[in-house]
Amino acid sequence: MVFSYYLFKPFYSAGWRLLNLLHKRQETVFYCHTPVDLEIWLPIQKYLKPIPIVTDKRETYKFLKGKGFSVRKLPAFPKAVIMCRVSAHKFPSQKVIKIGMMHGAYHFKRRTSAKNYLPFSLYMFSSQMDLDNAVSIGVTCGMVGGYPKLDPYLPTPAIPKRSGAKPKLLFTATYDSSGMSGIARWIDHLHELTDRYEIAVSVHPWTNPEYIQRLRAMQGISFIEDNPLHHIPDADVCIVDTSSIIAEICALDKPMISWKIPAARRSVPEVYDIIAGISIQIESFEELAGALDLALAKPAALAQERQQANKVFFDKLDGKAGERVARHIIDLLPENKL
């Protein structure tokens, strides 16, 4: 648990108890850390009574307001909170019921300590294998919920191609400070591809701001500021490293080219093995042209391997994960039933 939990807990807990004496706590809120959390939440919210959104992030507050959502700033003193994080310290009282779920599919980086799950009454994972991994490190509050973020994209939509259109490439990268990113292998070379390909780029929000500034300023590419999931269905090939977006690309059955990334502190060996099996792996940018030719010529070459990986990453890919997660929430908090 982070230090702020212990620092603020006495004051927050006292405030919660006082407010509960004055007016019994009955509200459930959704804590939205980033706009990505909203993408996960909306397919769940439609199966529940309206649940207020709260945040402590200025940019997230501005984003939600700009999209027309009603949102409040922390602190909040609810009966229960739902979140897509392991951020129980934002509500530092044992009296607040806490429900959590993953903000990315599966555990593409080594999981946080089981101690950080202890405040949760329920934490939902994207697949049985993901849950089994959590149990193996000592998590005791887990259930399988699925991955609601994908619901609006299932079944996979068919995107018609414009006649004469260039093939579309989607470059993705996790944050470089993780030691698991491939961004340094391609950022200086994107301009070499723009004549032949349409290029979109998405990077983790924690990526070095200098990289992000450079990408925003580049001519001939589309830098994705929001959810990259919108851009996967019409991509012809996705270029990846070790980010959990790989699971989303896999679910939508798109061919991938991956960089061979050395092991780092938070690497998960079995995930590296899966990535190697579902993608064309390369070491350097010089190998990319040949890999692209192969992926474009035979997009279904690793389709069976992607289907097998989906069984690891996800519970079911039926577009109903939001409904299943909502049922788990209702079992714990029946007052939120529609």
Feature roles, as predicted:
Residues M129-D132, P209-Y211, R265-P269:
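Short, glycine/polar-rich helix-capping loops at beta-to-alpha or helix-loop-helix junctions
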Residues S93-M102, D226-V268:
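A donor-sugar binding/catalytic signature common to diverse glycosyltransferases
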Residues W16-L21, R25-P155, G179-M180:
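Active-site and donor-binding regions of nucleotide-sugar-utilizing enzymes
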Residues I212-D226:
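Nucleotide-activated donor-binding/catalytic signature segment of Leloir-type glycosyltransferases, i.e.
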Residues V36-L48, G145-R214, I280-I282, L317-E323:
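Conserved catalytic-core segment of nucleotide-activated headgroup transferases in glycan assembly
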Residues L317-L338:
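C-terminal alpha-helical cap of glycosyltransferases
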Residues V2-R17, P119-S181, V203-T207, A297, ...:
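A nucleotide-sugar donor-handling region in carbohydrate enzymes
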Residues S136, C141, I245-F313:
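Catalytic binding pocket for nucleotide-activated donors in carbohydrate/polymer assembly enzymes
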